[in-house]
């Protein structure tokens, strides 16, 4: 309940309508709470530096607060990569081999992975749908592209300095696996920090702004 009123008058109660159902908020929160320890055991805490994992976690407060800015920020940051993940995954599932050649979803078909880890990794299928639904309900905040660019510029160097090339988190050591060797690591990182906003964030921004901006 929110209190509103006019000058010189007592405030009156005004009902605040929640735009997102608890039937979405509660199951999603439970899903993330179960996923976190499974991922921690299987891949370690560094795995949560993936931009998709950052978005997965950030959507918990975004859902409960119905926060348009945070939702928009996560959508502009991961929507296109998540769609690419789904394309790679379903093509591999149907054909049985890596069609795209980036080995982005190979881990989903490795027998040594914990079955629960593979199951919860299917959040990549659900996450873009959730993001688009929330943007549809809340609208798109055009400031998101600037904030997400700053986040990317902070997160990518952290991944480069604090994680192993073997993990190649956020592909800071090369596109796909194995890591690239054609230029020096720092130069490649700099190129990636410029390319990600240009080829991922800005196109997603224009698409979301055209489709969902209410201003």
Q: Where are the regions that the model predicts?
A:
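Short, hydrophobic transmembrane alpha-helix segments
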Residues: 37-46
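Membrane-interface transmembrane-helix boundary segments in multi-pass integral membrane proteins
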Residues: 159-201
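N-terminal membrane topogenic signal
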Residues: 12-27
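A basic- and aromatic-enriched beta-loop-alpha substructure that forms the phosphate/nucleotide-
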Residues: 75-114
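Short aromatic-rich membrane-water interface segments that cap or initiate transmembrane helices
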Residues: 105-119, 181-189
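Alpha-helical transmembrane segments in multipass membrane proteins, preferentially the mid-helix core
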Residues: 121-144
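Interfacial segments of alpha-helical transmembrane regions
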Residues: 62-81, 139-152
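Aromatic-anchored segments of alpha-helical transmembrane domains
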Residues: 30-37, 79-88, 151-163
């Amino acid at each position: 309940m929110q209190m509103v009123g006019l000058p010189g008058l007592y405030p009156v109660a005004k009902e605040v309508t929640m735009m997102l159902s608890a039937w979405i908020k509660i199951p999603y929160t439970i899903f993330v709470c179960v996923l976190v320890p499974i991922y921690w055991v299987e891949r370690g805490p560094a795995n949560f530096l993936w931009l998709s994992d950052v978005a997965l976690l950030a959507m918990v407060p975004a859902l409960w607060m119905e926060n348009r800015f945070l939702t928009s920020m996560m959508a502009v940051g991961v929507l296109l990569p998540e769609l690419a993940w789904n394309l790679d995954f379903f093509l591999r599932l149907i054909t049985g081999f890596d069609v795209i050649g980036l080995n982005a979803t190979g881990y989903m078909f490795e027998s040594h992975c914990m079955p629960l880890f593979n199951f919860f990794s299917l959040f990549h299928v659900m996450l873009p749908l959730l993001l688009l639904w929330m943007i549809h309900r809340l609208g798109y905040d055009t400031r998101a592209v600037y904030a997400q660019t700053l986040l990317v510029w902070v997160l990518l160097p952290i991944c480069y300095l604090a994680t192993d090339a073997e993990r190649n988190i956020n592909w800071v050591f090369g596109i796909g696996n194995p890591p690239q060797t054609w230029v020096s690591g720092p130069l490649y990182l700099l190129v990636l920090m410029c390319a990600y906003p240009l080829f991922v964030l800005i196109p997603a921004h224009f698409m979301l702004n055209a489709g969902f901006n209410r201003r």
